[in-house]
């Protein structure tokens, strides 16, 4: 029986069509695009086509607004650090408490260097308070960096409105759209977004390639200096094969956009309904009415998410957990804590993230496998007694966060 992969928010498999498009650029069209000979010209033309494909996916006005990078993290760092370098008189950054570590870790570093960092809180559904956000848009803010969609819950933020408010206040706005691109329509030419990050491996393209969208006229300072590549904005010989793959991925993302929002969405809903109909004391986290079509984050109370994942893996199902113990801490993820999910549930969150390759048969299999795994783990849980939770879970195991 084939394995079931439901961890597509972590990475996606590369489309066969994309692999085939990339192969010639390893062994046949291998020239440096900066070279004047035909080998270089062939690659240069292919890069231009890929740039235009990404431009179309993002709805950007100019293909020159597309800068190829190595990954989403590089794009995020470039955007934020550029905004600060271009405006040395401004010392404040606005972000959220639920950002990806690519942004949060950088903001923590900036805070240690003397910058003021405002981290916007979220409510129990992972939503932002726009009035609070607007009150922070002062003359000292250099950049706002807010993710378009949360990688754990799939909750979508009102990015267009937030960008407009920032732009009206004369503040640069950046969004990490790594999870959103290809799943929700984006029309940058009619938005107030100044900078946007994406990465290839969330789009069925290879790892090691990303994009920073930079609106024409936005003040910019390069992170990498050296050659003239990317119009002098990102030095280094282009990763041609991967960029070509990303271009094809952008074309296919447009082709499958409706599929993502209909068929994939329906499978995600079926997965949630099937599990919740059988498993008591479980619920979906995030905003069920405003989220990515492929993401289901389910909290299974009174058990550990990692234990669920290990048992799912034994039966050939790959998912991920929101409760990270990689640092030796028993705390759940920063996203669950920010949403004030009860500790008895936050420790048991599992994220199922689908793709256009996910089948109904695979979803049916997951629906069959999850309930007995949850029951098995609850039978040995200190929080569980018989057919329900103990009277006072806090006495069974003290929470490790307040």
From Swiss-Prot:
Homodimer. Keywords: Iron, Iron-sulfur, Metal-binding, Nitrogen fixation, Pyridoxal phosphate, Transferase. Its EC number is 2.8.1.7. This is Cysteine desulfurase NifS. Disruption phenotype: Fixes nitrogen very poorly; has very slow diazotrophic growth on nitrogen-free agar plates. A double nifS-nifV deletion no longer fixes nitrogen. Pfam families: Aminotran_5. It catalyses: (sulfur carrier)-H + L-cysteine = (sulfur carrier)-SH + L-alanine.
